[in-house]
Amino acid sequence: MTEGIRARGPRSSSVNSVPLILDIEDFKGDFSFDALFGNLVNDLLPSFLDEEADSGDGHGNIAGVDGLTNGHLRGQSAPLSSAPFFPEVDGLLSLFKDACKELVDLRKQVDGRLNTLKKEVSTQDSKHRKTLTEIEKGVDGLFESFARLDGRISSVGQTAAKIGDHLQSADAQRETASQTIDLIKYLMEFNGSPGDLMELSALFSDDSRVAEAASIAQKLRSFAEEDIGRQGASAAAGNATPGRGLEVAVANLQDYCNELENRLLSRFDAASQRRDLSTMSECAKILSQFNRGTSAMQHYVATRPMFIDVEVMNSDIRLVLGDHGSQPSPSNVARGLSALFKEITDTVRKEAATITAVFPTPNEVMAILVQRVLEQRVTGILDKILAKPSLMSPPPVQEGGLLLYLRMLAVAYERTQELAKDLRAVGCGDLDVEDLTESLFSSHKDEYPEHERASLKQLYQAKMEELRAESQQVSESSGTIGRSKGASISSSLQQISVTVVTDFVRWNEEAITRCTLFSSQPATLAANVKAIFTCLLDQVSVYITEGLERARDSLSEAAALRERFVLGRRVAAAAASAAEAAAAAGESSFKSFMVAVQRCGSSVAIVQQYFANSISRLLLPVDGAHAASCEEMSTALSKAEAAAYKGLQQCIETVMAEVDRLLSSEQKSTDYRSTDDGIASDHRPTNACIRVVAYLSRVLESAFTALEGLNKQAFLTELGNRLEKLLLTHWQKFTFNPSGGLRLKRDLNEYVGFVKSFGAPSVDEKFELLGIIANVFIVAPDSLPTLFEGSPSIRKDAQRFIQLREDYKSAKLATKLSSLWPSLS
């Protein structure tokens, strides 16, 4: 039988062939309709296919026939006849009809089987649902049973717990009663005769039961003391009943506890000598019952070698201060303290290991140890290096002065703060080691601001004495100096020094560093910084003001020398050497004062820069502190500004006096009224002009260097105005002809070219007007009225110059001008 169809017997190609028999199994699994169809028709078509293959090459096969290889028909088909083209069509139709009939039958069979299966499934489903319902009812009943059982178990458990509690309470009461009986028995033993400890139980004398004895003794003493306290309260209330108390027991217990404590301490010391940490720990644990073990802790700390060995203290002093009799320096002390405090930290660290292994409360022991270290060992060395000096009679600067004490204080404070941090890292329990460290320096810090200000004052006085000594030494080595050459010697020897001001700032900066170190609160820091900075302002103000005053004294001496020269000239009419000496003194004093002004400006700039970089940031956190310091700085420097202003006025007077002297001595009457002798006119400036410009160029060189900004502009403007007035006054002493007018124009060009270097527009304008006015000496008389038509404001000055014309009277210029300028007549 082939795949898909089972044949019952042979069949032919006729229409009346036997029907196909299809099996339902053919439709199970991977069913293929193509395969079924091929199996049905393969027995009818092979002859047709062979004939087609023989009759026509290239026509190909009928599509789908080659693939029909599955299935066969019952019987063998007859050879194909050549009459009809497709003779098996009837057989195929009959075949298909039979197949359809069998397929219908098969479907009915399948439908029947499906109905039967549905009924069976429905029946089984009903049975299954009924079974599940019964199971659920059984589970619910089971849960209820478990709940009842759990409730009974809980009830039984609670009852058992209550019974256990009662049993435990009863056992505790029994134990307490037993202990109370024992305690009462022991208490009665202690309440015997005063001081009689011989009849005590063996417990209190057995060394192996010391811990138990100590615990019982402490309980008995607490009870006895409480009983005495209650009796005292009742007596105070008037309810006391006469009877014997427990005073004897308390006294005997105290004696026994003291004796036991001393015995344990002795055992503890012996174990400590042997480094027997186990025995030490046992003793410490028992001793902790006596006053919480305070005596044992203190005893252990007090017996440390660093607290009882005198050689340790001597070694500390040698390490920090060096050999006896030598003057210690802050740097050496800093190194010594660092080494000493490192040794102390290492020792405390080693002790911490022992304390942790021995004591039940190591933190409390460490607190006592660290406190003892700071209060005894550290305080001992601080007392040696910090001897507080007296402000009434401070040590001299040659021996270090107050500054040495302050530097030592700062070094000691820094190193001790570092020690406190190291000890905190090692461990010091609940001890506030930082606060304790601060307390070691409290007496020094309370008076620190006064010592700092006194030190700055002492340094300033020492510096001034040093400068005065140097000046006196130079003066003595120079010998006798003539008045003409020595007018400014004393001033130059004590000239303002920027280096000295830098020293002031350096001292103050060091003081501010210490102030920052000692002042933890912003308000305190701001107040101390302000006070210390005020010291600097006072020092700089006094120093530069005195320096400017000395430079002014030199200017005054030069002015006095000029006055003597003038008086001498009036009397003797000849003092050329004296005049030159006075001029040299004036020029020297001018330059000296300009140097003083320049150094004064540099000094002020240094102070202002120092304030901006170091002081202001410390004052800003406190309201008003920064503004107050700025105001103080302005007030302090105003004195120096006033001295500088007066000195600059004197400088102008000195320069004008010398210019006046040069003009008076060098200007000749013929300079502006040359005779008409046929010689060509001299177009060079006059000798007086040349001398004046050369003098001004030389002397003002120092002013250009020393002054700057608005100060320079104001000084040169004032000098230019004074020079213009002086020249006007000077020229009104002469008579001018046209050649002299040209000479005057040449002088004016020199003066104008020089004053342009002043950079003062108002001065330039005045000298330009002088050049216009000088034209009155050059133009013809008839051109004078039209000369100032565009400049009516200078007609008054021009009229005074016109009167200096040589032909003023001969040309009757007064009459002409009065008619043209009636307002000026």
From Swiss-Prot:
One of its GO terms (biological process) is exocytosis. Expressed in seedlings, roots, leaves and flowers. Disruption phenotype: No visible phenotype, due to the redundancy with SEC10b. Keywords: Coiled coil, Cytoplasm, Exocytosis, Secreted, Transport. Residues 244-266 form a coiled coil. Pfam families: Sec10_HB, Sec10_N. GO terms for cellular component: cytosol; extracellular exosome. It is found in: Cytoplasm, Cytosol; Secreted, Extracellular exosome. It comes from the Eukaryota. The exocyst complex is composed of SEC3, SEC5, SEC6, SEC8, SEC10, EXO70A1 and EXO84B. Interacts with EXO84B. Binds to EXO70E2. Binds directly to B1L. Component of the exocyst complex involved in the docking of exocytic vesicles with fusion sites on the plasma membrane during regulated or polarized secretion. Involved in polarized cell growth and organ morphogenesis. During cytokinesis, involved in cell plate initiation, cell plate maturation and formation of new primary cell wall. Belongs to the SEC10 family. This is Exocyst complex component SEC10a. It comes from Arabidopsis thaliana (Mouse-ear cress). The lineage of its organism: Eukaryota, Viridiplantae, Streptophyta, Embryophyta, Tracheophyta. The gene is SEC10a.
